[in-house]
Amino acid sequence: MITTEIKRVKNHINGEWVESTGTEVEAVPNPATGKIIAYVPLSPKEDVEKAVEAAKAAFETWSKVPVPNRSRNLYKYLQLLQENKDELAKIITLENGKTLTDATGEVQRGIEAVELATSTPNLMMGQALPNIASGIDGSIWRYPIGVVAGITPFNFPMMIPLWMFPLAIACGNTFVLKTSERTPLLAERLVELFYEAGFPKGVLNLVQGGKDVVNSILENKDIQAVSFVGSEPVARYVYETGTKHGKRVQALAGAKNHAIVMPDCNLEKTVQGVIGSAFASSGERCMACSVVAVVDEIADEFIDVLVAETKKLKVGDGFNEDNYVGPLIRESHKERVLGYINSGVADGATLLVDGRKINEEVGEGYFVGATIFDGVNQEMKIWQDEIFAPVLSIVRVKDLEEGIKLTNQSKFANGAVIYTSNGKHAQTFRDNIDAGMIGVNVNVPAPMAFFAFAGNKASFFGDLSTNGTDGVQFYTRKKVVTERWF
């Protein structure tokens, strides 16, 4: 339930809401107004240790619960999420800032991840081959690995946690969740509904906080695996630190997603697709389109239509259904983004749509409007870096080959899209682009939860990705059994 009271956020350990043992707190503002809506604890190491102890104790019994029974609990959780999806979307808009339309879409994608987790009995099945030698059978069995942890970002406070703990718990593990201190309220509600579904205490534990919680998770000897989603520098740190302490780690990192626009594209649908990918959720998503490589033959026409349509977008509070671009998450991030826009101008790019100039009526929130640069090249910071904002760079290329070459020069390789009506162009793009997730006339090629989600190069650190069969393999260990009976 959303109230006007300033909330003091708690941890959830061993089935109970508890105050952090630390004294440090951080204010949580509504990004659309700047007004404080909550205070979140910056929990110390001791809180993480208590959560791990609770999860470790719960694992002894939870791991022995029959797999179908674990799924039945998740079906109850799924039902509760569906019944409360309007409230969940409003909490996301309140603390994250994205429009209610975007938040509602996120809720649905989170629910889809839980739907995947309910199918765990099928996904966990092993393999068997009889008579591999005379009288000898071979088989592979999958078992839970123990206490696992998830560290999640602010930009998808529902979807990304639901990628992690439902699947891990369905596999028989217990979980310690550390969500972003910038969006703690949705995490609280997810945990409340989880225990309403009837799960035993200690199966899921929530520890709020910042870097101290992250380090405590990475160094704790009883945590067997860590799932992470966030920026590239932090993902690299999480992967290196976690593996150094003997853990499995999957760390999904940053992006600089390119879209190649071919002369044979459907112009109207391509423009709307690029706008949706670049500017929805205020560009604060790792699958946002941040660079368009447009072929010279169609460049002027495409850019004219894109600019005209982008200038129609309204900026403001996400609860106003007329607004398309909500606020950025914090004032500090807004200042960082403005710095990138200024650097693009200083480096000689042409600013076609200036997101610094927005209507004063939007108020005191952390707003930057949709921004478009033309004449961008690979030497500019606005091409190189993940800005994580509604800032789109346009690079003109002579043909598909040059567009692919440009895209592959980025240090990131998360997602990439081509807009074309030519099957050969699509095939060439698919086979030669370096990206983990590829779209052909699909604006945001984020796969459904039953497929793996991960990029390449500096967009992903690890071996097994999140979601799908990769997720099940990450959260389980296999035993290969060779047996003979006399």
Curated annotation (Swiss-Prot):
<protein>
    <recommendedName>
        <fullName>Malonate-semialdehyde dehydrogenase</fullName>
        <ecNumber>1.2.1.27</ecNumber>
    </recommendedName>
</protein>
<feature type="binding site">
    <location>
        <position position="154"/>
    </location>
    <ligand>
        <name>NAD(+)</name>
    </ligand>
</feature>
<dbReference type="GO" id="GO:0006574">
    <property type="term" value="P:valine catabolic process"/>
</dbReference>
<comment type="function">
    <text>Catalyzes the oxidation of malonate semialdehyde (MSA) and methylmalonate semialdehyde (MMSA) into acetyl-CoA and propanoyl-CoA, respectively. Is involved in a myo-inositol catabolic pathway. Bicarbonate, and not CO2, is the end-product of the enzymatic reaction.</text>
</comment>
<feature type="active site" description="Nucleophile">
    <location>
        <position position="286"/>
    </location>
</feature>
<dbReference type="InterPro" id="IPR016162">
    <property type="entry name" value="Ald_DH_N"/>
</dbReference>
<dbReference type="GO" id="GO:0004491">
    <property type="term" value="F:methylmalonate-semialdehyde dehydrogenase (acylating, NAD) activity"/>
</dbReference>
<dbReference type="GO" id="GO:0019310">
    <property type="term" value="P:inositol catabolic process"/>
</dbReference>
<keyword id="KW-0520">NAD</keyword>
<dbReference type="InterPro" id="IPR023510">
    <property type="entry name" value="MSDH_GmP_bac"/>
</dbReference>
<dbReference type="InterPro" id="IPR016161">
    <property type="entry name" value="Ald_DH/histidinol_DH"/>
</dbReference>
<comment type="similarity">
    <text>Belongs to the aldehyde dehydrogenase family. IolA subfamily.</text>
</comment>
<feature type="binding site">
    <location>
        <position position="386"/>
    </location>
    <ligand>
        <name>NAD(+)</name>
    </ligand>
</feature>
<feature type="binding site">
    <location>
        <position position="181"/>
    </location>
    <ligand>
        <name>NAD(+)</name>
    </ligand>
</feature>
<dbReference type="InterPro" id="IPR016160">
    <property type="entry name" value="Ald_DH_CS_CYS"/>
</dbReference>
<dbReference type="InterPro" id="IPR016163">
    <property type="entry name" value="Ald_DH_C"/>
</dbReference>
<dbReference type="GO" id="GO:0006210">
    <property type="term" value="P:thymine catabolic process"/>
</dbReference>
<dbReference type="Pfam" id="PF00171">
    <property type="entry name" value="Aldedh"/>
</dbReference>
<comment type="subunit">
    <text>Homotetramer.</text>
</comment>
<dbReference type="InterPro" id="IPR010061">
    <property type="entry name" value="MeMal-semiAld_DH"/>
</dbReference>
<feature type="binding site">
    <location>
        <position position="178"/>
    </location>
    <ligand>
        <name>NAD(+)</name>
    </ligand>
</feature>
<keyword id="KW-0560">Oxidoreductase</keyword>
<dbReference type="GO" id="GO:0018478">
    <property type="term" value="F:malonate-semialdehyde dehydrogenase (acetylating) activity"/>
</dbReference>
<comment type="pathway">
    <text>Polyol metabolism; myo-inositol degradation into acetyl-CoA; acetyl-CoA from myo-inositol: step 7/7.</text>
</comment>
<dbReference type="InterPro" id="IPR015590">
    <property type="entry name" value="Aldehyde_DH_dom"/>
</dbReference>
<feature type="binding site">
    <location>
        <position position="182"/>
    </location>
    <ligand>
        <name>NAD(+)</name>
    </ligand>
</feature>
<feature type="binding site">
    <location>
        <position position="231"/>
    </location>
    <ligand>
        <name>NAD(+)</name>
    </ligand>
</feature>
